[in-house]
Regions:
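Active-site catalytic microenvironments for nucleophilic, acid-base chemistry
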Residues: 91, 117-120
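N-terminal [4Fe-4S]-dependent radical SAM core
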Residues: 96-99, 119-120, 124-158
Length: 158
């Protein structure tokens, strides 16, 4: 799998997600100015920056099938990363025919996200929706919520 990426600053997150979904399939990341190896399976990820926003675009080709998506984003690196990873996850899971139990979350503790969202004043329904937006299954989202409730009691008792 060849992945063409015009934003080196999101390479780690993109590569981690692709490796989780593709398993043992070799992944080659190609940055601007590098030669592109021949491979029928490819992903092209581009971020076009404008004044106050960006347009994120993902084209995934796998086993002769092609999926494409575009979405606006702010210029914030974290939001760009989340937008790209969400589109990438949706395109690859559609092409592969399987999802991951924790969705597109890589290297992130879901309970930590739940804690942060709770502390930001979000309601449980909003938090669950946000987690499912990340591709987290409803069962895993509920597990994260339950775990946070248990941890919260312990932390507050300290």
């Amino acid at each position: 799998m060849v992945v063409k990426l015009n934003r080196p600053d999101i390479r780690y997150e993109v590569e981690s997600l692709i490796r989780m979904l593709l398993g043992e399939t070799p992944v080659t990341i190609v940055l601007p100015g590098e030669a592109i190896p021949d491979d029928n399976d490819s992903i092209a990820i581009t971020v076009q920056e404008q004044e106050k926003c960006c347009l994120c675009h993902v084209v995934a080709c796998l086993n002769g099938e092609k999926r494409e998506a575009s979405s606006p984003s702010t210029v914030d690196r974290t939001e760009i990363e989340q937008t790209i990873c969400r589109m990438l996850y949706n395109q690859l899971t559609a092409l592969l025919g399987h999802t991951l139990p924790w969705g597109m979350l890589t290297g992130v503790r879901p309970v930590k996200l739940v804690r942060q969202m709770t502390e930001a004043g979000m309601a449980e329904a909003e938090i669950t929706q946000k987690l499912t937006d990340y591709g987290v299954s409803e069962e895993r989202a509920q597990l994260s919520m339950d775990t946070w409730h248990n941890q919260r009691e312990i932390v507050e008792a300290l």
